[in-house]
């Protein structure tokens, strides 16, 4: 893949990427993830903030439900933020979510940060 057609993750995208290596209870393997960080940061640093997505909805306060009709179904685990090198993790774009979902994510993580 050449630099000119390289996909750059953007806030609100759902992507697949490899979370391995991991330890303990961390989400692992090739899985869907929500992109939290803005495209400008992701492009400049080759890093991005990702939140794994799981089909196992458990009702935890940090889950953000994905609306029906998307290719990826489940919940964003907003408390599992990871900063990863997306170029080396084999990131693949799937789809983008609505502004409603993008706006709900920071609301869910605010109690962890303040």
Which residues are covered by each model-predicted region?
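Conserved functional hotspots at enzyme active or ligand-binding sites that engage polyanionic ligands
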Residues: 1-114
